[in-house]
Amino acid sequence: MIKKYKFVIGLALAVIFLMTTAGCSQDSGNVPIDSDDIGGVVTSSSGSEAGVWVIAETMDLPTKYAKIVVTDDMGRYLLPDLPDATYSIWVRGYGLVDSPKTQSEPGVTLDLTAILAPDAAAAAQYYPANYWFALLQPPPKADFPGTGEDGNGLPKTAQTQMHWIGDMKMTFSCTQCHQLGNKFTRELPLELGTFGSSVEAWEYRLQTGISGGGMFGTLGKLGRRRGLEIFADWTDRIAAGELPEVPPRPQGSERNVVVTLWDWAGEKLFVHDEISTDKRNPTINANGPIYGVTELSGDWLTILDPLSHEVTKVAIPPSAEAKNSAPGAINVPSVYWGDEVIWERKVVAHNPMMDSQGRVWMTGRDACRVYD
């Protein structure tokens, strides 16, 4: 099995804080709030629900905004310091299914009802993607080193099982761009079409969209035939009902975490790196703009103001010799975007950094792949 590591990939920018419970009343149900908070108690048919998430989300601000907190051992929660807006609020947690969304505004005490999952399969739909990804079974250690496509199907460069796993998970491989184990990747959606086998379905899906050529080429690092068989076996076992192990709910200080999210780049973009301060002195740029680069998907620096919730962009100038690296045509249409060329860029930017004066620096180069 693949070892599980906790990580987050997405278009949202997350800022994480810790709350302390010092000085709070320990009476069950007593949740003091300010005028910009929402708080209350989460219960289900089994009683108070500890260690579950309460999510508040709004589209009223210039960019989509969400705040997430965790209930304490008596099911109490506090969503602090919310911008003025109307929020959809619901409960999510291991062993539950999402509760119906309730509309509320800051300054309100709001008790919520959690919904117990009817069965293990329903509960598992909310488990982290990497728990599902851990069900993927890599080639056994005895199959290494690989003997090539004409041998055991594994590349000769894969000297050990860990080399093979590394090639799947590291730079320019699957998990650099994809959250393997999420619902779309752990299933074969009907939108892909009808195929004679799961191997054929995976061979097709890895060629779709603007990066289809790159994905299918990367498959060679895993052994094309064996790689397809391994991914097909993974989704087949999940389709047959195999479930990952049950993750633990947040415990102890994990319940003090407050996550704030802004969708700051758009559904077609891929924000690769971001910076908000000088790492040598994290007091620099307090509450100031947050800067992100869109790497392969655009030629600009994306900037979020966390106070106004507004997003702006600054173009990154390419060199005079740079060419647009977007393909002229999509070989296999994307399930989501069809034949649309969603990425066009001349610059590949990485690793923005902030200096002691709040200036942003980044590495960059001309896009390396040129399509005539």
Annotated model-derived regions:
Residues 18-37, 41-47:
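Beta-strand-rich domain onsets/edges
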Residues 223-233, 265-281, 285-287, 298, ...:
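Signature of short aromatic-glycine-proline-rich micro-motifs recurring in repeat-based ectodomains
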Residues 59-78:
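Short, acidic Ser/Thr/Gly-rich low-complexity loop/linker segments typical of extracellular
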Residues 58-64, 86, 90-107:
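A short, solvent-exposed loop/turn motif at the edges and junctions
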